[in-house]
Amino acid sequence: RAIRDVYKRQALGLPCAAVYLLALVVFIPFRYFGSSMYGLPVDVVGRGASAPGVHQDLASFLSALLSIYSGTLLGFVDDVLDIRWRHKLPIPLLSSIPMLVVYMAGGGSTSIVVPAWPPLLRQALGCSSVHLGWLYYVFMMLLATFCTNCINILAGINGVEVGQALVIAVSVCINDVLYLNIPGVIRAAWESSSDTPSPAHILDGYHGSTDLVVRHLFSLHLLVPFIGTSLALFLWNRYPARVFVGDTYCYFAGMVLVSCGILGHYSKTLLLFFFPQIFNFVLSCPQLFGLVPCPRHRVPFVDTGSRTLYPSCVRLTEHAFPTRLILALLEQLGCVQRIYDESGQVVGTTNLTLLNALLVLRGVRVAPASKADLLASKSKTDPVLRPAPVRHTLCVSEHALWYYTMGVQALGSAMAFTVRYWLSSIIFPAT
């Protein structure tokens, strides 16, 4: 039993990515069959279906494949060589170059709309939009870096990497479908004497904007196969996991999502669906920037007696005022638990991650650190503190923690839709 639980197949995100890329390559002839895009005549789609428009769309599609392929390859290299964090951060920058070049060659917009509320902003700038130029490309490169690494940072329990990517992908697909005239297609199919009504009805979508519809169809063509392959991988990676996805899947999933956002021209909307990942990054900042010691692994600990999880901890080597202030504030918010020794002095804290924060919020507590615990955590390179859990507090299994995490991810998607379709109509009334 112990051998089956310990020795798992690693980096199984690679077969998932390989099947996905193969499916998209096979899909290319069906996507561009005939003389126009999606099999629609030129007089229906307009200039977007002409030869230059089809070539530009094909270039975008191939650049997405190249970026996803390079991200997957570099992720697999990371799994094999175990690259350090400071070296792996620039990897997505290299993978994003093909799609950014195609975005630039296609005349992609580099302007942002200035919020209409408060009115002082537009009055001060004297315009309703600001042209960022090369700064917009810097933003998109940073977005590629964030989307790939944030999935990797929010990891540590069975199924959480694939689960969060699936929730985000399904949410983005729902957002894409909102731009399509699905009722019009159904109505045309019901009223048409032909068994297969013209697909032109799909282009009567969002406020009559053909460009928006084509962009979101492009996004759907990338996301639907991704959801299918990820679901198959999830069946093997869910608790109790039979395989591990590795960094390969994290890079692969991040590049798929960021390719849809950049080439679909909704990069800012895509960022809204990463609310939990943004929270996890902000929560981790004190450890990432050295205010609190950061061990190599911050995943929750397993209580061997009950087989449940409790927050992992780190020993505090310094007690600077900013560190004490941040930890006191986070403890008041219920995100961390400070660890005390037998004399009542603060000697450690739970690690600053979303998974540990959920355990603390659910009431899982850690006992005061003993002298033996403190002696065992004197390593400066990996200052892990391992106090025992408080047995009479709430116990949370790994399976339950996965459900809590997915609930937070779904709540983040609901917040994203609220911001995108309600709050944005107040701040950007003209758009």
Q: Where in this protein do the model-derived segments appear?
A:
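"…together with the soluble PPM/PP2C metallo-phosphatase catalytic core" -> "…together
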Residues: R1-L288, A416
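C-terminal membrane-associated helical module and adjoining short loops/tails
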Residues: I262-T431
